C-alpha cells in the first residue's frame, strides 16, 4: 500500500491521530514561536544586550536557549506563561479569517487530535473537547478508540485557557517529557496509534532530539506532512 492508502486504513480503524503544530495557525495571523519570544522580551523590558543574545539564539533556531535568557533576566515561568496566554488570546481576537486546514480536519468524524499549540483552534473549528494525556491512566488504551472520544484533542504543551498548563521553558519541557507517567502514556499512544504530524518544521534542535527520542525508541510507523517547496 502507498502512504495515502495506509493513512486511509488507519482512519477507518480509528487509529489515526493528527498531531498539529504551529504551522497551521500562522496563516491566520498568530505569532510564530520566534515572534512570541521577541514580544516577550519587549514586554518584560529585557536589556538590549540580552535581546541581542536572544536574537542570536533565535537565528540558530535555539528557542529554548532564547527563553532561558528571558527567565534568567528575572521573569518567572508563571509570568511568562500568563503573558503568552494573554498575547495569544489577543492575537486570536484579531486573527485573519482565511481558508485553513483546521476546517479540513473538522470534516473527519472518527478522529482524535494531539497538538503542541496553545491556541485551541482545534477546539474552535472541530468543536473538540480537551482530553489530558494523564487521563489515560484511568482507562484501557483500546477505549480511546471508542466513539465517545471522537473529536477530543490532547494539548501536549497546554492551552491558553489554562496559562498554568503552558509548556514553554526548558525546565517545563523536561518536567513534561521526562516524567515516568508521560513516557508510559505517550508510549501507549505511540504504539497503538499512527501519528500524522502537520505544521511542524522541526527546526529547533532540542525539539528534534525530543521527537527523535519519543518516536524512535520502539519501531512504529508515523507520518509527517511537509510543504512541497
Each predicted region: which residue ranges?
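Conserved catalytic-core helix/loop/strand module for nucleotide-ribose chemistry
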Residues: 1-229
Amino acid at each position: 500500500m502507498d502512504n495515502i492508502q495506509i493513512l486511509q486504513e488507519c482512519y477507518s480503524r480509528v487509529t489515526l491521530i493528527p498531531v498539529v503544530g504551529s504551522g497551521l495557525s500562522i496563516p491566520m495571523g498568530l505569532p510564530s514561536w520566534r515572534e512570541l519570544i521577541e514580544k516577550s522580551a519587549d514586554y518584560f523590558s529585557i536589556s538590549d544586550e540580552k535581546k541581542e543574545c536572544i536574537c542570536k539564539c533565535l537565528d540558530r533556531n535555539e528557542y529554548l536557549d532564547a527563553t532561558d535568557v528571558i527567565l534568567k533576566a528575572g521573569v518567572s515561568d508563571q509570568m511568562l506563561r500568563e503573558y503568552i496566554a494573554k498575547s495569544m488570546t489577543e492575537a486570536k481576537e484579531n486573527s485573519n479569517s482565511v481558508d485553513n486546514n483546521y476546517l479540513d480536519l473538522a470534516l473527519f468524524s472518527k478522529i482524535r487530535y494531539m497538538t503542541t499549540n496553545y491556541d485551541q483552534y482545534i477546539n474552535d473549528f472541530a468543536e473538540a473537547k480537551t482530553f489530558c494525556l494523564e487521563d489515560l491512566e484511568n482507562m484501557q488504551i483500546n477505549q480511546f478508540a471508542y466513539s465517545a472520544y471522537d473529536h477530543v484533542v490532547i494539548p501536549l504543551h497546554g492551552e491558553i485557557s489554562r496559562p498554568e498548563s503552558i509548556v514553554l521553558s526548558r525546565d517545563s519541557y523536561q518536567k513534561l517529557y521526562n516524567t515516568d507517567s508521560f513516557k508510559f502514556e505517550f508510549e501507549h499512544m505511540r504504539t497503538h496509534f499512527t501519528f500524522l504530524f502537520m505544521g511542524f518544521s522541526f527546526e529547533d534542535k532540542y525539539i528534534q532530539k525530543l521527537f527523535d527520542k519519543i518516536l524512535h525508541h520502539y519501531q512504529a510507523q508515523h507520518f509527517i506532512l511537509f510543504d512541497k517547496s
